[in-house]
Amino acid sequence: KYNCAHHELIASAKAVKLAHEIIGEDCMVGCMLAGGSFYPYSCDPKDVWQAKQTERGNYFFIDVQSRGRYPNYALKWMERDGVVLDWQEEDEQILAEGTVDFIGFSYYCSRCDTADPEVSAKRTAANAFRTVRNPHLQASEWGWQIDPLGLRLTQNDLYDKYQKTLFICETGMGG
């Protein structure tokens, strides 16, 4: 799965660079994220850690596409899993030269995560993600958490992290 992702990221960087070359530097090319804050289920440091790790997995593609390099946490995941990327000599330069200009994201609900196996066993579907129900939020009939403040938190998190123009592509009842 990591090599498939790597090839997608290389293709994205090449497409961004090509768009800038053909259309011009005024052309803006972005990437897309199924956005939404990941709250820890509790203030237990293990829950905070779990939520951060889950969020990292969600932001992995944008980390590479926005910064033009793999984040250290992803390299550690691959090392721990014994993954060897199909890395070509020019890939580092391709990623560095093909960073996106903006981040598009959809927001339908926030998500919640926990390290507690008993709570984790009660996950519910939230959009395309399985999440722990946040006891502080109401949910729609589809189980999506209704969290308009989460939209603002997501915007702030994305801008603080990437310093790129943001574009809300989709939103729904939860936002």
Can you say where each PLM-predicted feature lies in the sequence?
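Active-site region of glycoside hydrolase catalytic domains
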Residues: 1-175
